Amino acid sequence: MFLRAWGIARSLVMYHGVPGRHRRMLRLYGEFLRPGDVAFDIGAHVGSRVRAWRRLGAHVVAVEPQPDCLRVLRLFFGRDPGVAIVPLAAG
C-alpha cells in the first residue's frame, strides 16, 4: 500500500508539479487542438494531458485501467462535464 501511494505521489509531482511543464504542454498541444475538439488520452495516468487539453478547450475522453490512477482522475476531473473517464484498458 505504501509503495502504491508513494508511486502516485511521485507521479503527481513529476507530471503536475514541475514548473513550466504545463506551459510547454499548452504550447505543444495548442498547435493541434482547438476549443470544442475531442481528444482521447489512452492511458491517462494522473491526467497531466487531460489538464492541458481541457485548458485548451478540448473535450477529453480519458481511458485508464489502473484503480489508483482512476481515483486521481476522478478527484481532479470527476465533476468536469468536458471529461469522460473510462475505467478500461485499450490495446
Question: In which residue ranges do the predicted regions lie?
Answer:
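Phosphate/nucleotide-binding beta-alpha loop and adjacent structural elements of enzyme active sites
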Residues: M1-G91
